Structures are given as C-alpha cells and as structure tokens.
Amino acid sequence: EGISDDTIKGVDISSIVSLEDSGVKFYDFNNKEQDIFKTLSQSGVNYVRVRVWNNPYDKDGNGYGGGNNDLDKAIEIGKRATANNMKVLIDFHYSDFWADPAKQKAPKEWQNYTIGEKEIALYQYTKESLEKLISEGIDIGMVQIGNETNGKFVGESEWSKISKLFNAGSKAVREIDSNILVALHFTNPEKIGNYENISYQLSENNVDYDVFASSYYPFWHGTLDNLTTQLKKIANNYGKKVMVAETSYVYTNEDGDGHGNTSPANGQTLDYPISVQGQATSVRNVFQAVANVGEAGLGVFYWEPAWLPVGTSDNLENNKVIWEKYGSGWASSFASEYDSEDAGKWYGGSAVDNQGLFDFNGKPLESLNIFKYIMTGATAPKAVESIENVEVTVNSYKEIKLPKTVTVKYN
C-alpha cells in the first residue's frame, strides 16, 4: 500500500563497469546475454544510484578498488541509466575511498585544508562535477551530499563544521538545478536517539536539504516498525522527505568468489529465510515500511545487486589478480596507502555476492522482479521455506517423547 509510479525503485550498481571490465556477463530472464541496465529497467527499476570518489588512485595510477568509482565511471553509468529511462542519484562521498560511520577521511588533496578551504573545495568540486555529468545528458534527479555521515564528514567531527560543508554542497546543487533534490545520508536507525539527535543538529545549524536518507540492512538495523517511526518523526517534525538509500538481503549461504561475505555472520538477526523468496520478502517489506511514513516516503535503493564473482571460489588466486587489475573487489592492496587500517588489511573481492539479485553466473533471480511486483502483486506456488529446528533431550532407556507440532514457514 502507498506505492505509486512515482515511488523510487532504485539500485546502486556502482561496481558495474569494473565488473564488466573483469569479464563478468549479465543475462535476461531467458538466459540471453543482455545489457544489465536494460534488464533492470525491464524489471521495474526506475532509479540508479552511483557513488563518486574524488581520486581513488595511488600516485602510480593504481585503483583502490570498490569499482574505482571516479567521476568518469559515474558519467558512464549515468549515461547508460539515462538511456534506459532511469533517473540518477549521484552519491558524493567527498573522500578518495569508502566513507561510512567508521571513516570519513578527507580526500588526499584536501587533508591539510582549513574548514574554510574545505568549504570552497567541496562547493567547487560538486558544481564542476555536476556540470560535467549534466553536459553528458544524464538525468540527475537527486544528489547525495556525503555517505553515512553519522557525526563525521570530510575529516570533521563538529556539527557546526559538518553543517558548513553540507551547505557548501547543497549550494552547488541549487545553483546547478533547483529541481534536483538534495539528500543527506545516515545510518543506525536502531540506536536510541540517534536520528533524533542528527535531525536536531541539522535543524539547529540551518542545513539546507530535502531528503533524509537512511541505510537499512535487516541483519543490523533493528525492526521495520522502528525504521518507520524514526523516518516519520523526521518527516513530521522537520518537513523532510525520507527514503532508504541502501538495503539488501542474502539469498544463499554460498560464497561465490573465495572472499568472505558480510552476511550471514555471528551476532546478526536474520528474520527471513536465506532464499530468493526470503530476499524478495525482505525488500518488499522495506518498501512498505517507507510507504507507511506517508507522502514523505520516497522509496528504496537496493545496494549492489550485481556485485558478482569475477571467477569461481576455487580459483581465488586468479580472482585476486583480476580484483587488483580492474578494481572489481571491495578494495585492492593499493588502497592501503589511503586506508591502512581497514582496506590495507582486509582487501579482496565481493563481500555481497550472496546478496545479489543475480546469481553467480549473471542470470537475474526472480527477486529482481520485486520492483514490478510491489506495483502489481504476484502469486507464487505455496511452498515450505523453512522448518524451525527442534531440540529434544532424552534419557537413556526411557521413552522418547517427540513434540506434537513443529513450526513451518511458508513463502
């Protein structure tokens, strides 16, 4: 309920160019090789999100990996999305590599800048980048100023300084096109008081933005009822639009490329079966949670549904060569000069190949059609998804008493 043609049904496929360069191929539902952008559009996707790093290369031009997502990659992805009738969200990290709550490093070129110099640089970089993107005919509907900026941004941790940088980016967007929505992106809706504090700080510091975007991964971020509650507070108290900028779910326990996956893992709560149906149900429910906010709820982006293996899991050494050459793993060894504590230690392949909406061979899963089915509905044959494990304790030489019932979950 509450889903319309205007609802954002988005995906972030920022890694796609590096994957294709690595030899990964994609197919349609008839197992015929086809441009993935066409397949996505045919499956109901209407928006593509793409991350942009300032300079994800070392001094010798070696890419840090994670898709090597510089502006040129964004232009290529944006043009292909636009050609297939999908709007584009540009996700500026304002970093040379991954930005998230644990790390918000300034780009190498900006690391010794004062806050005033950072404001100017961020404004100019945003404006010049958008001018290049738009000159290529890319249909930009939204720009994200930062990525998961929970109290840190471009190396700054004081809200007064963070807010100045947000406004520098927002100003650039407004000057380019007042119709482009300005989004800010945060995470951890499950932490008590987190979003209340962030939205309060944004208001107190007069930050100019349109959309409060949240990450929501079911195995990390609490209940959907809480997500709706948190987003509804922001919509009602501050008059902002809201959305989920990242979500995903596992469809298999298998690892496709020999590099470990982020889920399932110890300490995670998996409320849906690990299956294609479980994945589809998870995504459907995230859409409903955002729609339950009301008119302010814009929609949902699925994160990296096509970050597939570049080779099989039993061919790890060859996979490593490909990841290093094309940047198609989550990080390359070259990233250690910029991010020695994380990428420098744990570089490698895809950590989400088992959360794709395509199988390891590039064929779309039925769960990809969820972007259509949330509009039309769909009926599947009734089938058992999972059976709850039951433990029985018995004593030697005594009658074994089995439970009268067990819990079965259907699709």
Positions of the model-derived regions?
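Solvent-exposed, low-complexity, repeat-rich "mucin-like" stalks and linkers
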Residues: P381-N411
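Acidic (Asp/Glu)-rich catalytic clusters
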Residues: I3-D5, D35-G44, E76-K87, E131-I138, ...
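Active-site beta-loop-alpha junctions enriched in small/polar residues
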Residues: I13-I16, W53-N55, H93-F97, I145-N150, ...
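Active-site cleft segment of glycoside hydrolase catalytic domains centered on the general acid/base Glu
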Residues: G63-Y64, N68-I75, A99-S203, V207, ...
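Glycoside hydrolase catalytic-domain groove-lining segments
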Residues: Q34-F37, D177-L181, E196-T269, S275-G278, ...
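Conserved, mostly hydrophobic/aromatic
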Residues: V11, L40, D91, V143, ...
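Aromatic-rich peripheral "rim/lid" segments of glycoside hydrolase catalytic domains that contact
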Residues: K233, T252-Q268, P273-R284, A289, ...
